[in-house]
Amino acid sequence: MTNADPHELQKFSDLAHRWWDPNAEFKPLHDLNPVRLGWIDSHAHLAGKRALDIGCGGGILSESMAGLGAQVKGIDLSNEALGVADLHSLESGITVDYEAIAAEAIAEREPGSYDVVTCMEMLEHVPSPAGVVSACAKLVKPGGWVFFSTLNRNLKSYLFAVIGAEYIAQMLPKGTHDYARFIRPSELAGFVRATDLHIVELKGITYHPIGKRFALSNDTDINYLVACRRGA
């Protein structure tokens, strides 16, 4: 059985045509991308590396990593999003190999094949995040890097990421997130410990509404990033 929620897939497929509009529903991803890209590159030094972007959607992060010199493959289960990603890759001239395949399936086919694996803003949208983390650990080469980002589960994250972002500021469409699927850092750490990955860094992401920008911080109460490495 595929580790995917049909409702979640349809939700993002319906918006796929707006993925690259920096002022539409995916504006937060566009605003967040330079921060997460810089953080990933500071650890993994992407130039010349083979990278896999799991849950790539329309390809915002995939193209950005390729632009820094990585050989990138992006995977997703939304054919609509992948169609948009392919088209934008042709328009931009930045080469990314896209495929509709689940993380668990490609892990069986290509174990230990990637220097870098990214799984950003995706774990909170699948039925079994532990299964995705396990697949990431299988996909990365010994000594390679795996990066996750997701949302903490607490009252503050509910108020800011759901009520604030979706209903008050309307930064995101209503229903984008299911609070019950948010993941505490301790829970994600448990998923990681069940593999041969180890956590190198945990960072928070803070949104500054006055400047309308994201920045790295030590506050992991809402959005957070985790850098992991596989043992050599």
Curated annotation (Swiss-Prot):
Pfam families per the UniProt record, alphabetical: Methyltransf_23
Question: Which biological pathway?
Answer: Cofactor biosynthesis; ubiquinone biosynthesis
Which key words tag this protein in UniProt?
Methyltransferase, S-adenosyl-L-methionine, Transferase, Ubiquinone biosynthesis
Molecular function terms from GO = 2-polyprenyl-6-hydroxyphenol methylase activity; 3-demethylubiquinol 3-O-methyltransferase activity; polyprenyldihydroxybenzoate methyltransferase activity
The EC number(s) attached to this protein equal: 2.1.1.222, 2.1.1.64
Q: Which family does it belong to?
A: Belongs to the methyltransferase superfamily. UbiG/COQ3 family.
What does this protein do, in the record's words? O-methyltransferase that catalyzes the 2 O-methylation steps in the ubiquinone biosynthetic pathway.
Q: What is this protein called?
A: Ubiquinone biosynthesis O-methyltransferase
Q: Which organism is it from?
A: Burkholderia vietnamiensis (strain G4 / LMG 22486)
